[in-house]
């Protein structure tokens, strides 16, 4: 299962905090998968078949700080454990254009991840794809920064990193299996 963390509503779609959903939309488009609204999972879902691996996709359609409800609901329904899920999210500690895969336990201050960990109520490592969005100079501006739209240069770097990450999914699938 691959989850792209996001906030709902059209006004947040292009914000830095929603880069996880950008990834899922790009991945679905790349593999000709259709995302559809699934109210029982509080989000949009799809499926991929990559190298004979059936992979479920999820974009929660609820606010970031409660994305765990959506992730846990879908994972429980399909009997998927947290360590079998790739969570794709924005990362303030990486510059735009930088991505990093991580397999560990923890949220690094990210409220979406924090809520997922709370909902699963288990201390296990899980996969994360961290997509760099950069950090504002003033730490008091973090909330407004993540809820703002990247400038043209940043957007180009972020989209390029997402394209690269999608090409590297085959490598990641070998790790998950």
From Swiss-Prot:
CDD domains: PTH (cd00462). GO terms for cellular component: cytoplasm. NCBIfam families: pth. Keywords: Cytoplasm, Hydrolase, RNA-binding, tRNA-binding. It comes from the Bacteria. Its EC number is 3.1.1.29. The active site is at 17 (proton acceptor). Hydrolyzes ribosome-free peptidyl-tRNAs (with 1 or more amino acids incorporated), which drop off the ribosome during protein synthesis, or as a result of ribosome stalling. GO terms for molecular function: peptidyl-tRNA hydrolase activity; tRNA binding. TRNA binds at residues 12, 63, 65, 111. Its main location: cytoplasm. It is an enzyme of class 3 (hydrolase). This is Peptidyl-tRNA hydrolase. Monomer. It is found in: Cytoplasm. Belongs to the PTH family. It comes from Buchnera aphidicola subsp. Schizaphis graminum (strain Sg).
């Amino acid at each position: 299962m691959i989850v792209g963390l996001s906030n709902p509503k059209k006004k947040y779609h292009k914000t830095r905090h929603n880069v996880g959903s950008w990834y899922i939309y790009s991945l679905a488009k790349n593999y000709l998968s259709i995302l559809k609204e699934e109210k029982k999972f509080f989000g949009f879902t799809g499926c991929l078949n990559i190298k004979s691996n059936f992979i479920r996709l999820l974009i929660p359609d609820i606010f970031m700080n409660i994305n765990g409800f959506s992730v846990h609901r879908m994972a429980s329904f399909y009997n998927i454990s947290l360590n079998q899920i790739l969570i794709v999210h924005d990362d303030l500690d990486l510059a735009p254009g930088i991505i990093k895969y991580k397999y560990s336990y923890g949220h690094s201050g990210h409220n979406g991840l924090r809520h997922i960990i709370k909902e699963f109520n288990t201390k296990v490592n899980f996969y994360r794809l961290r997509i760099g969005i950069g950090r504002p100079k003033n730490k008091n501006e973090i909330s407004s920064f993540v809820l703002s739209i990247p400038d043209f240069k940043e957007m180009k770097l972020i989209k390029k990193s997402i394209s690269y990450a999608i090409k590297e999914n085959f490598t990641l699938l070998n790790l998950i299996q």
